[in-house]
């Protein structure tokens, strides 16, 4: 069960912010491969920042949702990145270390960019102004209209729509990408399922097996009614 949870770690990072995995890999590569003075204030502050990112599964505080302010300089980080093996960095196709820095540094260093993981300020579009990666190109109004259309007033066991999906806009249409085997995060979820199936085989009793079986079924199908059964 612990291994199943570990397989989902990167999913949580990505859900908490679109650039979290890229930033974590940049930080970890410098942390492991840096050849300079590790007692230098910039490196020490990078290490502190990385540990906060690890603990919070992203660049925002896990409770307050405020973005962490790095105490190391952009100049230090750029130089450090240019002195590690570029093959270890999360470069997009055709991207150089400099263009990677240009793309990502505003997310790290500019306090106005993605400043809140979850924004709850009155009068603002809470979807567009939140850094959490549950929506892509979708407004709050569009998200509310999409999920309201799915609700059935006659359903005496309503599910929590949107709990296991990302809303995206493709060709001008809002679509739901469900987290499940064969869907969004499918490769990681298949690994979670693999470890849950191993846990099922060594469960101590039928109650444990029944609970694990429901969770496996939920990850395979993405059916929120199954998740309710598992939770209860």
Pin down the residues of each PLM region:
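N-terminal helix-rich structural modules
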Residues: 1-163, 167-177, 183-201
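Segments forming glycine/polar-rich beta-alpha architectures that bind adenosine-containing cofactors
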Residues: 192, 208-216
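Glycine- and small hydrophobic-enriched segments that form the cores of compact globular domains
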Residues: 223-226
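Active-site-proximal, well-structured secondary-structure segments within enzyme catalytic domains
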Residues: 230-232
